[in-house]
Amino acid sequence: MKKQIVIIGGGFGGLRAARALKAASVDVTLIDRRNYHLFQPLLYQVATGSLSAGDVAAPLRSVLSRQKNARVLLGDVVDVDPASRRVVLADGARFRYDALIVAAGSQSSYYGHDDWRQWAPSLKSVEEATTIRHKILYAFEVAERLSDPIQRRAWLTFAIVGAGATGVELAGSSPPAAV
């Protein structure tokens, strides 16, 4: 019987691990809560309207379609039981593993200030990028109808917190009047 490899997460790490096992005599099960791989480095372009969500999301099954020893399951892993070597999904399904790779990604931290989220959205998902895009477009729509230059400037002023790659790319792709 082939060894069962379970990979939690279909991001860069999870896909890299799955592909590295292509020639191995194992069965690979990749589990993710989304059925697509998100190319996160381009999310800023979704937020600014340069790309659509479909341009940065590739179906996981398509990405691994030529890999005969891999399957993709949609599910939310809620528990790992090392004693029985099983992962448990939110729907109660259990999957046995001989080896487990956890590549679940990351999320933004508001350091105990979750109320900041409404004013400082993170940019880690298609949904967040789309929300930012809608907020930017709404601000431009409101500003276009204003005759008072001070009010108009207030609606067209955005603050980008973070000087990592995402923050720099977002700032660099925003209209000059908006930054």
What are these regions (language model features)?
Residues 1-3, 70-159:
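FAD-binding core/adjacent interface of flavoenzyme oxidoreductases
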Residues 1-73, 78, 158-159, 165-179:
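Beta1-alpha1 glycine-rich phosphate/pyrophosphate-binding loop at the start
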